[in-house]
């Protein structure tokens, strides 16, 4: 049986994600962000609810991306996720994209020219952000064109780079429905952005989200729930440069900006520059919120849930892979567990996120 990996956030899970799972082949393993997102946002609903939604709509296994993989720039996010999926035996990687191109060809380009491509990045002016530099790199070495807001396409390029030398088949699937950032409700396949924007429109949510009750009946989280915690961290931290990726310039800008900022958007707008993108600033503010220092990654793979078919696959891997199915007295990943504790502080109805939790099991799947 083909084993297909999918890297996802499901923030929240919606009909477009269900379409991706239905289109992908074979046994489907999801490497999913935990309670904080790649662009530096708290998850709308917690990782366990999102896992359950995925498993009820086509996923066979859901594993958690550690905090220091989940909250990273595209290249590191892709590299960490693909490394985990390779340990779980994937043969191909399926992903949605605005531009279906020959990503497999891009793997070969990077395998042959990685040194030259990396060297080229160092020649570009420091005023450019890292995403701008990487776009120029792909344009020069592979002739890849960029047309406005194409975040999934940009992630696809990172997947190609991270897949070099790994013998993975990339399977791009054309994104259907609304664009990534669209707030438009008039689509059967509405975007996650539109769903987050219109959470109070239950009729829209019920048509846009499979198993919509799981979304409607659980706490909806955003930076608004954590801004006071962040402000306290910034104002009372003796040395922000001890936080991951915070340099002297950013520390100074953040310390000044927090004194006049009433919410996260104002703070991000004040701190961001051409060099420091808004996404990067949000990630750094997330690092400050959870007091993240130098990154370390766990050896084990945390299993959030599986179907009967997924369980059969995991049994084959159990003796050769460090699979974590319950976090107890022995920790899995200290940083992720700390981030979970802070996430839980945002709302009294969020249950324990780490200690003692066991995988979600969906038993109504037939074994093939």
From Swiss-Prot:
Its EC number is 6.3.4.-. The keyword RNA-binding applies. GO terms for cellular component: cytoplasm. The keyword tRNA processing applies. Keywords: ATP-binding, Cytoplasm, Ligase, Nucleotide-binding, RNA-binding, tRNA processing, tRNA-binding. ATP binds at residues 7-20, 96, 152, 175. InterPro entries: Rossmann-like_a/b/a_fold, tRNA(Met)_cyd_acetate_ligase. One of its GO terms (biological process) is tRNA modification. One of its GO terms (molecular function) is tRNA binding. It is found in: Cytoplasm. Its main location: cytoplasm. It catalyses: cytidine(34) in elongator tRNA(Met) + acetate + ATP = N(4)-acetylcytidine(34) in elongator tRNA(Met) + AMP + diphosphate. Catalyzes the formation of N(4)-acetylcytidine (ac(4)C) at the wobble position of elongator tRNA(Met), using acetate and ATP as substrates. First activates an acetate ion to form acetyladenylate (Ac-AMP) and then transfers the acetyl group to tRNA to form ac(4)C34. Belongs to the TmcAL family. This is tRNA(Met) cytidine acetate ligase. The gene is tmcAL.
